[in-house]
């Protein structure tokens, strides 16, 4: 396949995968607003916002180097370093949350109780997600990236909607966001 055609195939795979994944999200959001109380959705959004402040830098953006590193061995070292850094950042954030939760009764970490402890898990699993997207991007595995995005959103939707019908609350909403990237990792490991 020519380089020009492979670029278009990559664009098609990434574009279609992104659109389908977002369509799942667009369809599920109104369902979630009907089956979860407003307060539960608000707490969930709060937890996600605390996680998304850290997720983009969970590996200190070193995952970007994986794509461009010409040496395979060096790329593997970078990947390993990113995993370790992601673990460390998640643990540091967990410590900050634990200390913040214990120090005062009136701060952002103890506003909604112990549910705050799910945030470092969100950081860790989604940090891994971005790391392995970079790894797949290195090998131009755009179709796999798209399939993983679709499956991740579908699994998140099933977990969250199922939790809503079972009245499981904000923890289950958060777990949908935390667990769904792991299914993508499972697919990637098989490739």
Protein language model regions, located:
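Helix-loop junctions and terminal segments of transmembrane helices
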Residues: 55-74, 137-138
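Transmembrane alpha-helix boundary/hinge residues in polytopic small-molecule transporters
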Residues: 27, 61, 65, 127-132, ...
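Membrane-interface helix-capping segments at transmembrane helix termini in multi-pass transporters
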Residues: 7, 34-45, 69-81, 91-124, ...
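Short alpha-helical transmembrane interface motifs in multi-pass membrane proteins
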Residues: 9-14, 47-51, 84-85, 113-118, ...
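Alpha-helical transmembrane segments of multi-pass membrane proteins
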Residues: 53-54, 95, 99, 108-136, ...
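C-terminal transmembrane helix end/exit motif
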Residues: 3, 63-66, 131-138, 142, ...
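Hydrophobic alpha-helical transmembrane segments
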Residues: 113, 117-120, 147-191
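Signature of the first transmembrane helix
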Residues: 5-60, 94-101, 122, 152-157, ...
């Amino acid at each position: 396949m020519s380089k020009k055609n492979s670029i278009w195939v990559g664009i098609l795979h990434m574009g279609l995968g992104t659109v389908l994944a977002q369509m799942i999200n667009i369809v599920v959001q109104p369902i979630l607003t009907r089956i979860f109380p407003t307060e539960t959705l608000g707490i969930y959004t709060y937890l996600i916002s605390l996680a998304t402040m850290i997720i983009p830098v969970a590996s200190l953006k070193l995952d970007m180097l994986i794509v461009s590193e010409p040496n395979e061995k060096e790329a593997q070292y970078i990947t390993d370093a990113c995993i370790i850094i992601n673990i460390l950042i998640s643990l540091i954030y967990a410590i900050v949350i634990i200390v913040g939760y214990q120090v005062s009764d009136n701060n952002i970490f103890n506003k909604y109780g112990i549910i705050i402890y799910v945030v470092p898990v969100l950081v860790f699993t989604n940090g891994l997600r971005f790391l392995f997207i970079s790894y797949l991007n290195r090998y131009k595995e755009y179709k796999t990236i798209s399939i993983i995005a679709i499956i991740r959103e579908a699994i998140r939707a099933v977990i969250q909607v199922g939790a809503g019908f079972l009245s499981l609350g904000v923890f289950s909403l958060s777990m949908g966001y935390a667990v769904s990237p792991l299914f993508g990792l499972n697919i990637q490991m098989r490739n």
